[in-house]
């Protein structure tokens, strides 16, 4: 183990000088030794500048760091605990416990920089994963072992949707989950921990947090820490759920690190290595012949612009995209999923079956027609429409309201109990609305209910 000294500190970027014959490799973890608040601070090598000097990024706060401090090279990249010992625990980017519940007591550690599985090892599956959320199961069904993105601007419900998915899938699926909190609010991490504890699934979840107040190096690597833990479970032959909230903060941390390292920015100020950094992470989130990783990633959309380079780069890697719309949220329809913008590779008659495909297609057709008629209604009013168009509008408004659903995780705010709707009930409900079976029921009855039977019951009560 070679030792060096700190020669320059600029914020989170630290230059360290080593003897010429013992220069650390890129991604090696270095540790600061000696007195003071920085004792034990981990640095990750990013560049070799020549002359024995390496440029590193600090994985913690660099307050109190000064020139001349001694640095020890660990000789390998950052490694984190893996295996069942991590379940029920909250860890940071280095795998250290931050839940005040003692040491992890792991039997094995993995380095966080690993290569993706080869083509021969990867498996292809078309098994569906039921979420219990009507709009998702109908329009953008998830595949087991697939990648899902929840796209949305600020405050349209990405985290609430993700919490509901964890609540529904983690409980029903009874598999293991890994939650990586990347650059999000500490309060949300705290809420998530107690939510899991109260629902009794804490012993099946490993949590890794690198919150908003952490330095960029920490936020850039915390997603890899969570992924490494999920990979271990997958390689043991288990089916794992990996939740990442929020993948945009991973990109943003990369932008900060890139700027600190002096790289020339690319479009909209993002790092020139954006596509490669995203690829390195996403290519590792895959299912092998041994086990599967099903990942759900929240993607913040800056200024609600889906063409922004960050969400646009993420799109390419996903099997299903759930787009949350501010317009739908403003109508009071939650989850605010846009059924016309959301997509899934699984929505294919060969995968979901002909009936499901036809119903989903019918719902989208009716909603699209209603969207086109909105301008005419705004100018001329409903009376000018043909009888057929009036029928379309009436059914579309019922469908819109029926796409809403009370969530278990939002019971505290809404006061109404959450509903889990099976795929069979979802298809039956929408098929009935499209066929005109429920034309006699007022549209208000479809708002915030679970299955179609509840809507009928609600309408009968109002009579």
Swiss-Prot record:
Keyword Membrane annotated: yes
Pfam families to which the protein is assigned, alphabetical: ATP-synt_ab (PF00006), ATP-synt_ab_N (PF02874), ATP-synt_VA_C (PF22919)
Keyword flag Membrane: yes
SUPFAM superfamilies listed in its UniProt record: C-terminal domain of alpha and beta subunits of F1 ATP synthase (SSF47917), N-terminal domain of alpha and beta subunits of F1 ATP synthase (SSF50615), P-loop containing nucleoside triphosphate hydrolases (SSF52540)
Reactions the enzyme catalyzes: ATP + H2O + 4 H(+)(in) = ADP + phosphate + 5 H(+)(out)
Locations listed in the record: Cell inner membrane
UniProt binding sites for ATP: 152-159
Record PROSITE patterns: ATPASE_ALPHA_BETA
Record-listed E.C. numbers: 7.1.2.2
Keywords: ATP synthesis, ATP-binding, Cell inner membrane, Cell membrane, CF(1), Hydrogen ion transport, Ion transport, Membrane, Nucleotide-binding, Translocase, Transport
Main location: membrane
MF (Gene Ontology): ATP binding; ATP hydrolysis activity; proton-transporting ATP synthase activity, rotational mechanism
An annotated GO cellular component: plasma membrane
Subunit structure: F-type ATPases have 2 components, CF(1) - the catalytic core - and CF(0) - the membrane proton channel. CF(1) has five subunits: alpha(3), beta(3), gamma(1), delta(1), epsilon(1). CF(0) has three main subunits: a(1), b(2) and c(9-12). The alpha and beta chains form an alternating ring which encloses part of the gamma chain. CF(1) is attached to CF(0) by a central stalk formed by the gamma and epsilon chains, while a peripheral stalk is formed by the delta and b chains.
Record function comment: Produces ATP from ADP in the presence of a proton gradient across the membrane. The catalytic sites are hosted primarily by the beta subunits.
Protein name: ATP synthase subunit beta
Species this protein is from: Shewanella sp. (strain ANA-3)
């Amino acid at each position: 183990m070679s030792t060096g000294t700190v020669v320059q500190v600029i914020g989170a970027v630290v230059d360290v000088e080593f003897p010429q014959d013992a220069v650390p490799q890129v991604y090696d973890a270095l540790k600061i030794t000696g007195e003071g608040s920085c004792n034990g601070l981990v640095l990750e090598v990013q560049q070799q500048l020549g002359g024995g000097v390496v440029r590193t990024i600090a994985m913690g706060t660099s307050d109190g760091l000064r020139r001349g401090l001694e640095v020890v090279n660990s000789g390998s990249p950052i490694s984190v605990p893996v295996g069942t010992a991590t379940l029920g625990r909250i860890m940071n980017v280095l795998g250290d416990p931050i839940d005040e519940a003692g040491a992890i007591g792991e039997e094995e550690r993995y380095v966080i920089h690993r290569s993706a599985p080869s083509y021969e090892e990867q498996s292809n599956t078309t098994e569906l994963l039921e979420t219990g959320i009507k709009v998702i199961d109908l329009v953008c069904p998830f595949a087991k072992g697939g990648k899902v993105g929840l796209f949305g601007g600020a405050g349209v419900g990405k985290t609430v949707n993700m919490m509901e998915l964890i609540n529904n899938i983690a409980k029903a699926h009874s598999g293991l989950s890994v939650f990586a909190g990347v650059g999000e609010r500490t309060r949300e991490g705290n809420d998530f921990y107690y939510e899991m504890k109260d629902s009794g699934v804490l012993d099946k979840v490993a949590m890794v947090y690198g919150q908003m107040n952490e330095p960029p190096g920490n936020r850039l690597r915390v997603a890899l820490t969570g992924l490494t833990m999920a990979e271990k479970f997958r390689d043991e032959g288990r089916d794992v759920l990996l939740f990442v909230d929020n993948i945009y903060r991973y990109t943003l941390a990369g932008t900060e690190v890139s700027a600190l390292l002096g790289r020339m920015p690319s479009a909209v100020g993002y790092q020139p290595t954006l596509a490669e950094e995203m690829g390195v992470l996403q290519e590792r989130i895959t299912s092998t012949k041994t086990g599967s990783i099903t990942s759900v990633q929240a993607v913040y959309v800056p200024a609600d612009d889906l063409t922004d380079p960050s969400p646009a780069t993420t799109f390419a890697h996903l099997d299903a995209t759930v787009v949350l719309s501010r317009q739908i949220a403003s109508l009071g329809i939650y989850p605010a999923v846009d059924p016309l913008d959301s997509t899934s590779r699984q929505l294919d008659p060969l995968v979901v079956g002909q009936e499901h495909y036809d119903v989903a297609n019918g719902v989208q057709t009716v909603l699209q027609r209603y969207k086109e008629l909105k301008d005419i209604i705004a100018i001329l009013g409903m009376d000018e429409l043909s009888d057929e168009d009036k029928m379309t509008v009436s059914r579309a408004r019922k469908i819109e309201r029926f796409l809403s659903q009370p969530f278990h995780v939002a019971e505290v705010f809404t006061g109404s109990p959450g509903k889990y709707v099976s795929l069979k009930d979802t298809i039956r409900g929408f098929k009935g609305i499209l066929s005109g079976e429920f034309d006699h029921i007022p549209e208000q009855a479809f708002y915030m209910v679970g299955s179609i039977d509840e809507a009928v019951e609600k309408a009968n009560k109002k009579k």
